[in-house]
């Protein structure tokens, strides 16, 4: 019985939510946080262009794009993640800083970090993302290759009307793009 209680206590402790990634920024000033997110944005885009050169064409024709750096953990039946990012408009307007949170259920154990890039074909799609945020419900999975489109759209997933998504993992471009109860929203502290 004592061993069972010890194992149960261990399992409960390990399944506690992880501090959000943006909590790591708490000791930094808003200006430092913004600078770090912009640097992270440049690194994500450079990596995307290196792994998928055609993506540059898609971004070049777009109204803008968003990058997010995410960290997630799953232990036993529950998991979650968080991250930060920025929306860059093609018109060189002020960047819009964002946050994301993810909740997932199902058996598994693991820790992952990944980057997500959204490319917005239209101002309408871009403004909707900025002003209303965005949520993936349940288990939304999109194949990361659309053979019919080819070129710039190859290895990107069309996740909404006028919105394309790339997901980068430690191993490169994800073969499948998954969002499990993920919400994207403006960071009110960094957009002041």
Report residues per predicted region.
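Bacterial N-terminal signal peptides that target proteins for export
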Residues: 1-8
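Small-residue-enriched, tightly packed secondary-structure blocks
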Residues: 24-192
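C-terminal segment of classical bacterial N-terminal signal peptides
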Residues: 14-22
């Amino acid at each position: 019985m004592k061993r069972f209680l010890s194992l149960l206590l261990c399992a409960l402790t390990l399944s506690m939510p992880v501090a959000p990634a943006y909590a790591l920024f708490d000791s930094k000033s808003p200006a430092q946080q913004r600078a770090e997110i912009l640097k992270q944005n440049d690194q994500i885009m450079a990596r995307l262009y290196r792994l998928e050169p055609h993506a540059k064409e898609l971004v070049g024709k777009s109204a803008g794009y968003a990058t997010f750096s995410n960290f997630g953990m799953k232990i036993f039946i529950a998991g979650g993640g968080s991250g930060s990012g920025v929306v860059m408009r093609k018109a060189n307007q002020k960047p819009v800083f964002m946050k994301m949170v993810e909740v997932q259920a199902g058996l598994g154990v693991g820790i992952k970090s990944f980057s997500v890039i959204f490319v917005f074909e239209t101002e309408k799609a871009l403004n909707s993302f900025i002003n209303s945020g965005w949520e993936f419900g349940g288990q939304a999975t999109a194949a990361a290759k659309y053979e019919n489109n080819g070129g710039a759209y190859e290895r990107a997933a069309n996740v909404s009307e006028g919105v394309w998504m790339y997901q980068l993992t430690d191993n490169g471009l994800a073969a499948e793009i998954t969002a499990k109860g993920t919400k994207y929203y403006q960071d009110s502290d960094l957009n002041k």
